[in-house]
Design a protein with these regions (language model features):
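Active-site activation/catalytic loop segments of kinase-like enzymes and analogous catalytic loops
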Residues: 255-302, 316-334
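Juxta-kinase regulatory segment immediately upstream of eukaryotic protein kinase catalytic domains
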Residues: 4-43
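A short acidic, glycine-rich active-site loop
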Residues: 82, 142-146, 279-285, 343
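Catalytic-loop of the protein kinase fold
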Residues: 220-222, 227
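Helical subdomain adjoining the active site within ATP-dependent kinase catalytic cores
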Residues: 304-307, 311, 323-367
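All-alpha amphipathic helical-bundle segments outside canonical DNA-binding/catalytic cores
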Residues: 173-174, 305-317
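Catalytic activation segment of kinase domains across protein kinase-like and atypical kinase folds
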Residues: 231-260, 271
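ATP-binding pocket architecture of kinase catalytic cores
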Residues: 46-220, 233-237
Length: 367
C-alpha cells in the first residue's frame, strides 16, 4: 500500500500548483495588465503571472496582485481543431451558472482580441480551496472520503436540475440527439488527429450511432466532471467550485453522470488520462461509495428509479475519452500540446478503445 500511496502523492505533486510559464505559452504581461486595468472591476497591479501545472487542453495561469488572485484560461497557440478550446463557451456557462447560485467561479471578462496575449482568453476569480487529484483520497479518513464523494454527487445532481433556459443557456447547444451529435463530433476529431489504426475505434464508429437509447432528456452537462475538476472547501469535505467547462454543452445528464462514474470501471491507474481508477480498491474500508451506491445516490437526488443501458453509456464514454486523448496525440504530433504529460496520456487511446468495445459487446454488439 505504501508504494500506491507514493504513486498517488507523486501524481498530486505532478499536477498541483504552479510553475514558471512555459516558453511556448508566454505573452506580453504588461499588455495583459493594461487590459485588466481597463476591463476587470477593482483591479490594481502590479501583476505577476504563473502557469498551473494542470490543464492539458487550455493553458491556465494564476494572476497575482498585491490584493487578490485571478485565474486566466486561454486558447493554446498554434493550429487548432475546429470547435476545440472554446473558451468563449466556458466563459458563458460559468457566468450563467454562477449567477443562478451554482458552484462556479465569478467571471470578470472574455477577450476575443488576439492582439492582447495572442489568443482568446477569459479571467475569473481564483477560488481558494483544495484541488485533489487522487480519487482514493490519501490522507483522508473514511468518513471524510464518503462526505467528499457525497458532495461530488450532490453537486452534479444540482447541475442537472438547473433550468437551462431560465439560466440564460437555452442557446448553449442543440437540444436533443445528444449522443448522435457527440459520437459524430468525436469521430471527426479522432479521424482528424489519427496517428495509428485502431480496429475497435472503427467498429465503435459504426455501432454507437445505431444503438443510442431512446430517452432524450436535456440538461446542462459539464463534460469532464471528476474530482480534480472541482475545488473543495479549504477545511470541509464539500465542493465549492467546479472548474474546466470546456466540454460543457446542452446534453444528456446520464452521459455526463456515467462519465463521472468511469473511475469505478477504469482498468488500472492512469489509463483514463486523468480520470484515475478505483476499480481494484477496497472501497468499503476506504469509506468510498461503491458504483452501485453512487448511482443510487444520484438517482435518489434526480428522482430516477435507476439507470438502464449502463453498458452503452460506458462504451460511449470510453470511446469519447479515446477521441479526446487522440486529439491530444494529434497535438503532440503537431507540437502544440500544452502539457508535458500530454504524450503519456496520448498513449492510452488504444486501451480505452478496447475497453469501449468490451462494453459494446456486453450491450449486444456483434450478436
Amino acid at each position: 500500500m505504501a508504494s500506491d500511496n507514493a504513486a498517488e502523492q507523486s501524481r498530486q505533486d505532478q499536477f498541483s500548483g504552479t510553475k514558471e510559464v512555459a516558453e511556448s505559452h508566454r505573452f506580453d504581461e504588461a499588455r495583459l495588465e493594461a487590459y485588466m486595468q481597463a476591463h476587470v472591476e477593482g483591479f490594481k497591479g502590479p501583476l505577476t503571472v504563473e502557469q498551473f501545472k494542470g490543464g492539458q487542453s487550455n493553458p491556465t495561469y494564476q494572476l497575482i496582485t498585491p490584493s487578490r488572485k485571478y485565474v486566466l484560461r486561454r486558447k493554446p497557440p498554434g493550429k487548432l481543431l475546429p470547435s476545440a478550446h472554446a473558451v468563449d463557451r466556458e466563459y458563458k456557462v460559468i457566468t450563467a451558472l454562477h449567477n443562478v447560485g451554482f458552484a462556479a467561479p465569478r467571471t470578470y471578462c472574455l477577450c476575443e482580441d488576439d492582439s492582447v496575449i495572442g489568443t482568446a482568453f477569459y479571467i475569473m476569480d481564483m477560488v481558494v480551496g483544495r484541488v485533489l487529484w487522487e480519487p482514493l483520497l490519501p490522507g483522508q479518513n473514511p468518513a471524510t472520503r464518503w462526505k467528499i464523494y457525497d458532495s461530488l454527487n450532490a453537486t452534479m445532481a444540482h447541475l442537472h436540475s438547473i433550468d437551462h433556459v431560465k439560466a440564460g443557456l437555452g442557446d448553449f447547444g442543440k437540444p436533443g440527439n445528444y449522443f448522435a451529435r457527440q459520437v459524430s463530433r468525436w469521430t471527426k476529431q479522432y479521424v482528424a488527429s489519427e496517428t495509428q489504426t485502431i480496429t475497435e475505434m472503427n467498429k465503435l464508429m459504426e455501432w454507437l450511432p445505431a444503438n443510442i437509447p431512446s430517452d432524450d432528456t436535456v440538461s446542462v452537462v459539464h463534460g469532464d466532471y471528476r474530482l480534480d475538476n472541482t475545488v473543495l472547501h479549504p477545511t470541509e469535505p464539500k465542493v465549492i467550485a467546479v472548474l474546466d467547462w470546456e466540454l460543457s454543452t446542452l446534453g444528456h445528464p446520464l452521459g455526463d453522470f456515467t462519465y463521472s462514474c468511469m473511475q469505478w470501471v477504469m482498468p488500472g491507474q492512469g489509463t483514463g488520462g486523468g480520470t484515475g481508477s478505483i476499480a481494484t480498491a477496497d472501497l468499503k474500508a476506504l469509506g468510498i461509495p461503491t458504483l452501485e451506491q453512487y448511482i443510487a445516490m444520484y438517482c435518489e437526488r434526480t428522482n430516477r428509479s435507476g439507470i438502464d443501458n449502463l453498458d452503452f453509456y460506458f462504451a460511449y464514454n470510453f470511446f469519447r475519452l479515446a477521441g479526446i486523448l487522440q486529439g491530444i496525440a494529434g497535438r503532440v504530433r503537431d507540437g502544440t500540446a500544452s502539457s508535458e504529460h500530454a504524450k503519456a496520456m496520448s498513449e492510452n487511446v488504444r486501451p480505452l478503445a478496447e475497453e469501449a468495445w468490451k462494453y459494446a459487446l456486453r450491450a449486444g454488439a456483434g450478436s
